[in-house]
Amino acid sequence: MRMARHLFLFAFALGAAKGMDGATFTRYLERVTTMDPALSQSIYDSRAIMLVYRSVLGVDYEARPYALAPDACELPEVSPDGLTYRFKMRDPDLTAHDVVRSLERLRSPDIVSPNGWMMKGVASMMALDDCTVEIRLNSRCHYFPWLMAMSSAAVMKGDGSGTGPYELVKWWKNHEMVFNRRVPSPGKFDTVRFLVVDDVSTQWLMFLKGEMDFLGDVSRDNWDAVVGVDGKLDPALVAQGVELHSIPTMDTMYIGFNMRDSVVGPNRKLRQALNAAFDYPAWEHFYAGRIIPADGPIPPGIEGRLETPFQYGFDLEKAKRLIAEAGYPNGIDPSTGRRLVLTLTIGRASQDNRESGELVASFFEKIGVKLELAFQTWDAFLKSVNEGRVQLFRIGWVGDYPDAQNFLQLFHSKNKSPGPNHTDYVNPEFDAEYDLALAANTAEERNLHWIRCQEMVREDCPWIFTHFNKSNSLTRPTVGNYIPSVFSYGYEQFYEAKEVK
């Protein structure tokens, strides 16, 4: 393991030190914590990783609805029983042995990958020769090819280096990352530059001054300067050649309850009360209508989503009744005569996070519950969540593929931390229903099981379902061929560098 880590770091140390002549694409990005595919835990990690590596499969840049595409490998041949997948190598600089080695790292006990859940259904994996990988599953898995398109399925060479479109040439932690294109491509960006800029006002000013080509999300504070009352882009920005791109995402955002916590874990009525106290109209207003209030874990547009109203949606009178039934009438703990105090841990103390956290506290205040806010750095926050050292925590899940399973896996007991089930929710009935869905032979049968899974999660409330994101991005006229996507990992390779006259 120690040698493997040394090789991984050494591979980046050998990246080309010289810059290439040509255009540079600059955007801000939240802190990247790792460039190791097996250890990646955030979309920010994924965006950097997919510039340097190629996943087993990719997602077609242009196709809508979203569709898989070849990447390191061609699309697989699948056996009639749906258990065996054969992948032919497509990247001449990689071998089948590289693929097997990279995927095996996900389930290595030495690495303890947070993405090991991806490989739990794999019975065997082997390189039949240099050009062919065979993966056999324990049972049918209709979404397995989508797992092979995730950044965690990125393929490393033996020395830890990648064969993606770019190579990392500079990484100033918490400040800047610079990537140079391995092979120059006429009309495309030769350099990609990620900047860590915490202050949203600074991000906005840098974009207006042309110091950034792309703004990945228009902040709440700047929304009125971007979009007029008619819902259209401000004419002054249009005159500068700026374009607004708005699409629904597959992001589900939530406040999680640590189910191992002695206060919130065993008290379902308390969790239901806090859900009912969450003021969705006020939350949507806070975000200037740039979000979709959530009614469960699955975003709109995903097949198998439960469409009935959430029984613990905002209802202050119901919340007051439930908090009393939970043993805290008016938020008071009868055993102490004092108010119930809960702690919400949030990663990164940005202005938006502070203000939105205070808003949540005001919601709980209306049923007598005091909410204290604790802020940590992103790395420390993830560690605290994975180790169960939080009570309530605010986080989200960015869908890896458009399937209900991708969101409902967040509640399966086999995926407890450090897997994606960060709340450590355990419900044997849910697990059984989930497993039946995976074994279903038809989409109709599978969706019935997904509906039952969602009904259980809605009743147990291991989350406060806060919202689903919309993507509202801006490009300057320096960027061409930009197609907004929920799978925007490594897509900078397709952008065209435009000269502004």
Task: Walk through the language-model features, giving the residues of each.
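Aromatic- and charge-enriched surface segment that lines or borders ligand/interaction sites
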Residues: 75-111, 134, 203-209, 264-266
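Ligand/substrate-recognition segments at binding pockets and active sites
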Residues: 27, 173, 293, 326-399, ...
